[in-house]
């Protein structure tokens, strides 16, 4: 099908999101199979899933990068992004949600809402992404559809409304009643569940289904209060309501985020996936439903609102970079307005750099087809962009617009890395540079004292996988040190400094004079450097050099050399020398000045605090809580159900190394835990002294 046949209202940009083992990739695989994109279904546990295309993903059976793919169903074009469920990869989820219009949340019928599902759900709330839910693995021992729906309401605050009623469960799961069409769907075993037949609702379920349908209709009546005709029908004659009417109100409720309809099935057994595809098209929004996108006009500084129209000015967001051994650097983009043509010259307005597009590709996991253009609403990939990274805006050269950025969290864990041989040094530098372009939560820095290269990321698994990729994709052999906590430094009061950098060594000297004021910035806002120089006391051409010097000075703190965060620096005064001043002198002076000001601003060390969730049998609860307290943990709350307790706590990362091993021995291997970065907090004085001594 060519793209011209699809209006904007027939495009669906959706994500599939879930906890690590809820069966998300399997669900996506089945969608690809039924929508005719793969001829043989890939199985995750055989390591053959189409969407899990990196070697490490196939070995570990988890999805690391969000693969993007396009399928066609019911006359609509669906772009699907499969997101990872492991907490170390939350930036992948965050950046795919930013460019989606709707999502399918997959839950495990046995465990319902798990800790990672909460994280992903919160991220989707942040971007206002409409969601429908799919309760998967209905064929597993202990599957409980209504229990899963209840846990969505309790733990996520979701308005979860069943639209299915399962027929049987565990090994007896044979199909479901569709509460909208009031038909029972039985999957035919001889087609491995790919086909089904419609029958009347079985007698033993009729009463339950009538109650559930009434609850569904009453809920829908509150979604659209302006639709009085629908409300009257619900109250007076619910049987006269047509399927079409229900779909219309349901679509409105889903798009406005007022309702989360819940379907059930077993993707692995092919049950319920086609029903899921139907409602993706019927209920989830098109780019038109999501409305205008906001941006800032760089020339005027004013907010602009861009209509989703293919004739409007170009505005696209780069949301992922991938390095491909054959094509080189691939940039994934979402187009919010306008049309992007192959070979065109465009502007990266975030970096103020011109770019040229050499090829446009439509992706299917890691297969690709060339395209001549992408237009509004499309998600696609471009080759040829040199400067663009995640979160950058691409626009027409004469229309300088910047879209809202994708925020990357600060890394929490560091490792030293060095090449095994001298010959690997160059290759290692290239590999680190390529990987940090792809992944904004992976940072590379140099320890000033030891000269070691330090890599930083969101957790041990994150850095492990990146190390694997270096060996496989870049053929680099490297040794890594033990994981260390990524501390930061900040200041706690306002201060100022006046610094002169003067060198006279025969011939031309060096002269720079800079006065700074610094103050603590809001937590999480990052560093800001502004120039308040007036009257040319420092000439305009030297200001960028001062700013660069200040930024470099902030890279290593004054207590223990950790990077400074949340510091606001104002360059307020200075002077220069006609002959001896240079960019170099002002850069060095800027760096010295900010260090001097920080020393006087009561600097402190910050440490990453993790949100830890432990699920443990109740008889081990006391031991688990005692152990978390010993690790300087702050218990946030606990809840119990079915002899299992869930504890949530905030614990410093430095106390959590090797936690899984000690948790196993505390609970005889029966407890599980997840951990995600929460925020940075001030280190207690005694521990700060120990860190500084090191």
From Swiss-Prot:
It is found in: Cytoplasm. One of its GO terms (molecular function) is translation elongation factor activity. GO terms for biological process: ribosome disassembly. GTP binds at residues 18-25, 82-86, 136-139. GO terms for cellular component: cytoplasm. SMART domains: EFG_C, EFG_IV. PROSITE patterns: G_TR_1 (PS00301), G_TR_2 (PS51722). InterPro entries: EFG_II, EFG_III, EFG_III/V, EFG_IV, EFG_V, EFG_V-like, EFTu-like_2, G_TR_CS. Disulfide bonds: none annotated. Keywords: Cytoplasm, Elongation factor, GTP-binding, Nucleotide-binding, Protein biosynthesis. Residues 9-288 form the tr-type G domain. NCBIfam families: EF-G, PRK12740.1-5, small_GTP. Catalyzes the GTP-dependent ribosomal translocation step during translation elongation. During this step, the ribosome changes from the pre-translocational (PRE) to the post-translocational (POST) state as the newly formed A-site-bound peptidyl-tRNA and P-site-bound deacylated tRNA move to the P and E sites, respectively. Catalyzes the coordinated movement of the two tRNA molecules, the mRNA and conformational changes in the ribosome. Belongs to the TRAFAC class translation factor GTPase superfamily. Classic translation factor GTPase family. EF-G/EF-2 subfamily. HAMAP family: EF_G_EF_2_B. This is Elongation factor G. It comes from Chlamydia trachomatis serovar L2b (strain UCH-1/proctitis).
